[in-house]
Design a protein with these regions (language model features):
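Generic cytosolic/nucleocytoplasmic N-terminal low-complexity/intrinsically disordered segments
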Residues: 2, 15, 45-46
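Short, flexible coil/linker elements and helix-boundary hinge sites characteristic
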Residues: 13-14, 41
Length: 66
């Protein structure tokens, strides 16, 4: 799925998503308007999360995880 679809899945559908570059147990999910959380419960500012994930490789390769 695309980056845009992954963001919508998290923010509108409440899903956890992972990218092909993530480890097998890694994911992110939306927490509120400004933060995501990861599989360890760490809060990640959205602007920081996407700030270091720029470029074509991050525009696709997303999936919903259980």
């Amino acid at each position: 799925m695309t980056k845009e679809a992954a963001i919508n899945a998290m923010e509108q559908g409440g899903y956890k998503v992972a990218h092909r570059f993530f480890g097998s147990n890694e994911y992110i999910a939306a927490c509120d308007d400004d933060y995501y959380y990861d599989e360890e419960g760490l809060m990640l500012p959205k602007k920081d999360f996407w700030g270091c994930r720029q470029g074509e490789a991050w525009n696709t390769g997303w999936r919903i995880v259980g």
